[in-house]
Swiss-Prot record:
Binding site for NAD(+): 10-15, 36, 100-102, 124-127
EC number(s) given by UniProt: 1.17.1.8
Pathway this chain belongs to: Amino-acid biosynthesis; L-lysine biosynthesis via DAP pathway; (S)-tetrahydrodipicolinate from L-aspartate: step 4/4
Xref: InterPro entries: DapB_C (IPR022663), DapB_N (IPR000846), DapB_N_CS (IPR022664), DHDPR_bac (IPR023940), NAD(P)-bd_dom_sf (IPR036291)
Keywords tagged on the record: Amino-acid biosynthesis, Cytoplasm, Diaminopimelate biosynthesis, Lysine biosynthesis, NAD, NADP, Oxidoreductase
The protein's name: 4-hydroxy-tetrahydrodipicolinate reductase
Main location: cytoplasm
One GO term of the biological process aspect: lysine biosynthetic process via diaminopimelate
Subcellular location(s) per record: Cytoplasm
GO cellular component, one term: cytosol
Family as reported in the entry's similarity comment: Belongs to the DapB family.
Length: 271
């Protein structure tokens, strides 16, 4: 079987460079395209060199339609507007679209869902094995404990992260809500400030911290009467997300059109 031909979107960014390095380390995949935003000063540069590798001859381009001719998939950790633009082209080409972009709105998610009758999309707020196992455990614990245990999710990331709560925190919140059989949108408590009154029973709280170079720390706290359960994950290098994205792409290659998650990829959907 020939290598899976992949495009990295946002190839000049931190995650894009990590993805390029991960592809170079992984059997069965090859980098055939590197996408960057129109007007970027990085256009035309070699993706390998940008990632700290030997030159690989793949130049950064802003033309996804041309890059995607003959490709098998695209790895997309960019920004919502770019991802939504990429969704349409990936669907037209019928290639695997792995989406790790965070900060997507409900309308963005609706656009993504609308193409999955013809597109193969793997979308997750976090691509690492550890975080998805944490999400599965969160769902199980939330299911097992009654509303007497309050759920709080605390996350910390580097000072340059532009969205909050993180996509991973929301992934964990969705897992907790699923365990409680409630809608997260109706039970989410964010950004408490001032005189907020007593905590509402059944809320799922979020706290976001930003500073330094933290790759990603997440804790799910179940606080009950006189006892507390904490589940936590600390990411030490974003390469865990890059290798997870590659696992997702290879798993999805050849699958029927649809919207999948890392829970599907890792076999944790029914955990």
């Amino acid at each position: 079987m020939s290598d899976m031909r992949l495009i990295v979107a946002g190839a000049g960014g931190r995650m894009g460079r990590a993805l390029t390095r991960a592809i170079s380390e992984t059997k069965g995949v090859v980098l055939t395209g590197a996408l960057e935003a129109p007007g970027s000063e990085l256009l035309g540069q070699d993706a390998g060199v940008l990632a700290g590798l030997p030159a690989n001859g793949v130049k950064l381009s802003a033309d996804l339609w041309t890059l995607s001719a003959g490709a098998d998939g695209i790895l997309d950790f960019t920004v919502p507007a770019a991802t939504i633009a990429n969704v349409a082209i990936a669907a037209q080409r019928g290639i695997v679209h792995v989406i790790g972009t965070t900060g997507l709105s409900s309308s963005d998610n609706a656009v993504i869902k609308s193409v999955t009758d013809q597109a193969i999309v793997v979308k997750s707020g976090n691509m690492s094995l550890g975080v998805n196992l944490l999400a599965a455990l969160t769902r199980r614990v939330a299911q097992s404990l009654d509303a007497g245990f309050d759920i709080e999710i605390v996350e910390m990331h580097h000072r340059a992260k532009i969205d909050a709560p993180s996509g991973t925190a929301l992934l964990l919140g969705e897992a907790a809500a699923a365990g409680r059989k409630v809608d997260l949108d109706d039970h989410s408590a964010r950004g408490r400030d001032g005189v907020t009154g007593a905590r509402k029973t059944g809320d799922i709280g979020f706290a976001s911290l930003r500073g330094g170079t933290v790759t990603g720390d997440h804790s799910v706290i179940f606080a009950g009467p006189y006892e507390r359960i904490e589940l936590a994950h600390k990411a030490e290098d974003r390469m865990i997300f890059a290798h997870g994205a590659l696992k997702a792409a290879q798993w999805a290659h050849g699958k029927s059109p649809g919207l999948y998650s890392m829970m599907d990829v890792l076999g944790l959907a029914e955990f």
